[in-house]
From Swiss-Prot:
Belongs to the bacterial ribosomal protein bL34 family. This is Large ribosomal subunit protein bL34. Signal peptide: none annotated. The keyword Ribonucleoprotein applies. It comes from Aeromonas hydrophila subsp. hydrophila (strain ATCC 7966 / DSM 30187 / BCRC 13018 / CCUG 14551 / JCM 1027 / KCTC 2358 / NCIMB 9240 / NCTC 8049). Coiled coil: none annotated.
Amino acid sequence: MKRTFQPSNLKRKRSHGFRARMATANGRKVLAARRAKGRARLVV
């Protein structure tokens, strides 16, 4: 059985990157919540 985590920076950015978050209303909600909480890093 292969391991489930096969790292790829491209996939990482495309699914969890800033532009991916900004592309949907819910993604923008995620960013707003992380800003409100005071996260040092908003994405990835």
